[in-house]
């Protein structure tokens, strides 16, 4: 996944998502070639699902009120930051092995 996904989000939403990721609010992360699923803990626990095509998000869903109107939310951004961080960690780990 490249960094182009960040263009899907308003700057302040992206920053809030980064904070949620940094604060370890993303849990139960499942990442496959075609889909990402996770829970994000904030004021409540929200479910996020992201469909992928060629490693890029093509459809995103979150059950928070903000995303209910079709907006991209901080929970979606947090999950994508978490996937990016996990892939970076695994890549660095494989280089060391």
For the regions a language model picked out, list residue spans one by one.
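Long, low-complexity, compositionally biased intrinsically disordered regions
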Residues: 1-97
């Amino acid at each position: 996944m490249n960094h182009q996904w960040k263009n899907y989000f308003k700057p302040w939403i992206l920053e809030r998502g980064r904070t949620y990721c940094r604060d370890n609010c993303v849990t139960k992360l499942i990442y496959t070639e075609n889909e990402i699923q996770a829970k994000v803990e904030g004021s409540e626990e929200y479910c996020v699902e992201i469909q992928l095509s060629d490693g890029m998000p093509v459809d995103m869903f979150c059950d928070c009120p903000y995303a209910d109107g079709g907006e991209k939310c901080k929970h979606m951004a947090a999950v994508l930051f978490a996937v990016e961080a996990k892939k970076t960690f695994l890549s660095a780990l494989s280089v060391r092995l």
